[in-house]
Amino acid sequence: CPVAEEHFLVPAHEARGTQGEDQRPAGAASELELQEEGPKLGEERPKPEAGALEERGPRPVVSIVRPRHGPKRKPAK
């Protein structure tokens, strides 16, 4: 087990550097792709977006419901 932990820690530091470098160009590329797709979606359906904004305005804000993290535990006696 200690060998596996040491083996895991060393590549983790190396992987963090490579992941950070890989994520930045990938993130920039994905942002460019999203920007290219964004106008296309906007051109295809500008009316539903405008309608959605109009509908959201007068509606009251709904309270945020937090996701549950499993069933409630009974107190130990």
Swiss-Prot record:
Q: Where is the composition biased (Basic residues)?
A: 66-77
Domain of life of the organism in this record? Eukaryota
Q: Where is this region: Disordered?
A: 1-77
Locate the compositionally biased regions of type Basic and acidic residues.
Answer: 1-24, 37-58
Extract the PANTHER family matched here. CHROMOSOME 16 OPEN READING FRAME 86 (PTHR37867:SF1)
> Signal sequence span per UniProt?
none
Protein name in UniProt: Uncharacterized protein C16orf86 homolog
